[in-house]
Curated annotation (Swiss-Prot):
Taxonomic lineage of the native organism: Eukaryota, Metazoa, Chordata, Craniata, Vertebrata
Tissue specificity comment: Expressed in blood islands and yolk sac blood islands (at protein level). Highly expressed in mammary tumors. Expressed in eostrogen-induced epithelial cells of mammary glands. Expressed in brain, heart, kidney, lung, liver and spleen. Expressed in embryonic stem cells, embryoid bodies, endothelial cells and fibroblasts.
Protein's recorded name: BCAS3 microtubule associated cell migration factor
Organism: Mus musculus
Domain notes: Has been proposed to contain 7 WD repeats. This prediction could not be reproduced.
Entry GO terms, CC: cell leading edge; cell periphery; cytoplasm; cytoplasmic microtubule; euchromatin; intermediate filament cytoskeleton; nucleus; phagophore assembly site
Transmembrane region(s): none
């Protein structure tokens, strides 16, 4: 019986790490009435209900999903194997307690594995440092000690420093402390990548080199934020974004935030309330002036402005992006006297102070939020090698959460950057659909497993994008040349919400002639398609679906398992991050919980459109949510532009919170510990790329075997230049040729051997016999040509299909085809001279022998040329496209281009006229 209970238990000890292994548990979805009953049970104290108390849990202060060597897909060779299962990167979860911290790893198998656990007092921030990026002049001084863990705890290693003023670096291989960085002011957060370790202080940022941990640069001009992030920053693979306290005109980038133009019923009511409040405030100020507290004519704002007159006032909502590689050592100062070395972008993002920000995986997109939490902005940063003032910042999306205030604590992107999840202190995660290039999210963009192009093939071939831009320009839109309505996002009419538009954006700083700013997709206002809410009370996991207030989706309420009920505190008013939430996208791991007997290979046969969303809350429960996008149910007809709605459903949960009875799991670890194996694999790959790998050195030991076979092919001296031999294809061929569209006309040019008649009334008449020297048509006097008498009528042809086969070149030498754009305007005389060319040498002598077959052969060839069939190629493989000046001609590759006069055929395969009284009726007497 005990063995059965041990087998069914979701927890068991790990063999390789010695920690605890937690199996995923299937989530049962309750009905609406069951959710209400569960909610009432949670509200009623357990003393009245008489239910037994569950085991005591430790208090969680913060939660975080970490990126380290364990899930580094770019440098870990374990994830480079193709067409094999089990190579998806694991999830790495870090939990901070009031006494210590804990690290979990959730591989693709679904069993959460405890990797690290310690109790040494409160921990404010912690990071697992990835292996540094090596170079020709960069060596890792701590290679033998890695992986390293950076911890900011209440009591530092020295014990004499103030609380949270020290960063201690511990080796997870040996367990010793290898470095300690002291500060005079408290530390609020830690960030790291392959290049630097960033320590976030109040209004300051300090960056240290990842190889030596010596100070690289520091920033002292950060704008303070009331919380939860006292100094919000975003660290990508190379760029660092932070909130600047001033806007410097000479460094300001082109573009920036646009107005949101959102005015719902709730916003109208709140605006009226604010107006009433401001009116009452003015009445109070008048009463104060009459009583003599303040002198007449002086307000509190004037007093505050007078107090700050000694220094320039701080400006909220400004973002500065710097390049951590090119920025100079020492202080990074953005001022009018400083140069722009290392400054990537400098632009206004919000009116209020910035609360949270995050880069996507590529570093091109930046999401920012302010302290109000109504709207979140998505920017696309297009750099310029000259300076930050030439950088283009495109405001792609405004993600509208609602009209109530909420502070954002976490932002995450999906791996393909088509979904953004923003979590607030209220315990709600908002799911927004976006596109990496902007534009309206729809069925075409989000119902495919892969990212689609910005325009479909139909839109490209039909020219819909150009038509839309033309209509927009006529209406004075983003492409309007009118001053003030520039092509920049900041010139949009929606920009009226920003009160300081003149100071933030001007026509000079947003030049419509900037090629990086036009054409741009219009600013899109996107509402969340789903809200995944963590409840204010503790109870069993429940779900409630229904139409969402702002979006066309469904929203769910999920709660973790029942624990000891704390005092009922509103999450929005909780202090110290008590209601913390973190989210991340990843491969589904619920297959084992829902189908215990199903193999992984069979479950992975179905390709999902969206990866699973994992959310962990301060209750220590990790829940996997499935996201299923679909066309909106209210749409009468489904097309590519149909709006979206999504359904979310919980699939599996892991209870990761520890109890006081759990043992600690501290280094030194075994050689087969996942963190140690990952560090060895990444270090081996770094040495392999740098070419400093000792000969005969064995590869790292991994969970899936050695990588000697993978690395042996690229370790020799003869393969040092293998990268230069790689061929890449940046684009595929066109699905149809440009000349196949209805905008192009096809005209047939005929040749004449003996007599060429321009028109019946023309004075130009060239006649020669067989023995005469042929006169080239290019020798004609252009002033004498009566082109108006030709009466050339344009012929509009239907779009033709891509040629499937080609005829022999020898069968085509009698006809030359001219391609003419219908929409273009050009001189007809120039076209005639360029198209006709010159007569071949010895034309009359060589063609006398076949004179009797010329007329019938010409009819057949002209009829074949006009046939729009894939089997009969109009332009054949022997025909090449030549461009002379502004005219494109299709000439034979044999090199003999015959000059002739265009002719208009009224019927398909109609018999050719032979009466010479007609203008274009003559045929050559000899033809090859």
């Amino acid at each position: 019986m005990n063995e059965t209970m041990a087998t069914d238990s979701p927890r068991r000890p790990s063999r390789c790490t010695g920690g605890v292994v937690v199996r995923p548990q299937a989530v049962t979805e309750q009905s609406y009435m069951e959710s209400v009953v569960t909610f009432l049970q949670d509200v009623v104290p357990q003393a009245y209900s008489g239910s037994p108390l569950t085991e005591e849990k430790e208090k969680i202060v913060w939660v975080r999903f970490e990126n380290a060597d364990l899930n580094d897909t770019s440098r870990n060779l374990e994830f480079h194997e193709l067409h094999s299962t089990g190579n998806e990167p694991p999830l790495l979860v870090m939990i901070g307690y009031s006494d210590g911290m804990q690290v979990w790893g959730i591989p693709i198998s679904g069993e959460a594995q405890e990797l690290f656990s310690v109790r040494h007092g409160p921990v404010r921030a912690a990071r697992i440092l990835p292996a540094p990026q090596l170079g020709a002049q960069k060596c890792d001084n701590f290679a033998e000690k890695r992986p390293l863990l950076g911890v900011c705890k209440s009591i530092g290693s020295s014990g004499t420093t103030p609380p949270y003023c020290c960063v201690d670096l511990y080796s997870l291989r040996t367990g010793e402390m290898v470095k300690s960085i002291q500060f005079k002011t408290p530390i609020y957060d830690l960030h790291c990548n392959k290049r630097i370790l960033v320590v976030v202080l109040q209004e300051k940022i300090a960056a240290f080199d990842s190889c030596t941990f010596t100070k690289k640069f520091f920033v002292t001009s950060c704008y303070p934020c009331p919380g939860p992030n006292m100094n919000p920053i975003a660290l990508g693979s190379r760029w660092l974004a932070y909130a600047e306290n001033k806007l410097i005109r000479c460094h300001q980038s082109r573009g920036g935030a646009c107005g949101d133009n959102i005015q719902s019923y709730t916003a109208t009511v709140l605006s009226a309330a604010k107006t009433l409040k401001s009116g009452l405030t003015m009445v109070g100020k008048v009463v104060t002036q009459l009583t003599g507290t303040l002198p007449s004519g002086v307000t509190e704002d004037d007093v505050a402005l007078h107090c700050n007159s000694r220094r320039s006032p701080l400006v909220p909502g400004i973002i500065t992006v710097i390049d951590t590689e090119t920025v100079g050592e020492g202080q990074v100062l953005v001022s009018e006297d400083s140069d722009s070395d290392g400054i990537v972008a400098h632009f206004p993002a919000h009116e209020k102070p910035v609360c949270c920000m995050a880069f996507n995986t590529s570093g091109m997109l930046l999401v920012t939020t302010d302290t109000l939490g109504h709207d979140f902005h998505v920017f696309q940063i297009l750099t310029h090698p000259w300076s930050s003032s030439q950088c283009a910042v495109h405001h792609l999306y405004t993600l509208h959460r609602g009209e109530t205030e909420a502070k954002v604590q976490d932002i995450c992107f999906s791996h393909d950057c088509r979904w953004v999840v923003v979590s607030t202190l209220r315990g709600t995660s908002h799911v927004f659909p976006i596109n990496p290039y902007g534009g309206q999210p729809c069925v075409r963009t989000h119902m495919s497993p892969r990212v689609v192009n910005r325009m479909s093939r139909f839109q490209k071939s039909a020219g819909l994008e150009e038509i839309e831009q033309e209509l927009t320009s006529k209406q004075g839109g983003r492409c309007s040349p009118v001053p003030g309505l520039s092509s920049s996002p900041s010139g949009s009419p929606l920009h009226g919400k920003l009160t300081s538009q003149d100071s933030y954006n001007n026509f000079t700083n947003n030049n419509p002639g900037n090629p990086r700013l036009s054409p741009l997709p219009s600013l899109m206002v996107v509402t969340p398609l789903a809200q995944i809410k963590q409840p204010m009370t503790l109870g069993t996991i429940t779900k409630r679906t229904g139409p969402y207030l702002f979006g066309a989706g469904c929203f769910s309420i999920k709660a973790p398992c029942k624990v000891k009920s704390p005092p009922q505190i509103s999450p929005s008013k909780s202090m110290g991050g008590e209601f913390c939430v973190a989210a991340v996208f990843g491969t589904s791991r619920s297959w084992f919980a829902n189908n215990a007997g199903l193999k992984r290979e069979k479950d992975q046969s179905k390709q999902v459109v969206v990866e699973s969303l994992y959310i962990i809350s301060c209750y220590g429960t990790l829940v996997e949510h499935m996201i299923e996008p679909r066309p909106i149910s209210t749409a009468p007809k489904i097309s590519d532009d149909t709006p979206l709605e999504i359904m979310t459903s919980p699939r599996a949960s892991w209870t990761l919170v520890r109890t006081p009875q759990w043992n600690e799991l501290q280094p030194p670890f075994n050689a087969n510990h996942p963190l140690l194996l990952a560090a060895e694999a990444v270090q081996y790959y770094q040495l392999l790329l740098a070419g400093s790998l000792p000969p005969g050195s064995p590869g790292p030991i991994t969970r899936h075997g050695s990588y000697d076979s993978l690395a042996s092919d690229h370790s020799g001296q003869e393969d040092e230049e293998w990268l230069s031999q790689v061929e890449i294809v940046t684009h595929t061929g066109p699905h149809r040729r440009l000349w196949m569209g209805p905008q192009f006309h096809f005209k047939t040019i005929q040749t004449s051997g003996q007599t060429t008649v321009i028109s019946t009334s023309s004075s130009v008449l060239q006649s020669h016999g067989p023995s005469d020297t042929p006169q080239p048509l290019l020798d004609f006097d252009t002033d004498d040509l009566d082109l108006n008498s030709l009466r050339i009528q344009p012929v509009r042809s239907d779009p033709v299909s891509m040629p499937g086969s080609s005829r022999a070149v020898s069968d085509r030498r009698g006809v030359s085809t001219v391609t003419d754009a219908a929409s273009g305007t050009f001189d007809r005389s120039v076209t005639l001279l360029e198209v006709c060319g010159s007569w071949p040498e010895g034309f009359g002598l060589r063609h006398m022998s076949s004179m009797e077959h010329s007329e019938e052969g010409l009819r057949e060839r002209l009829a074949d040329a006009m046939a729009e069939s894939p089997s009969r190629d109009v332009v054949g493989s022997g025909t090449e496209l030549q461009r002379e000046g502004s005219i494109e001609t299709l000439s034979n590759s044999s090199g003999s281009t015959s000059g002739s006069i265009p002719r208009n055929f009224d019927g398909y395969r109609s018999p050719l006229p032979t009466n010479e009284s007609q203008p274009l009726s003559l045929f050559p007497t000899g033809f090859p």
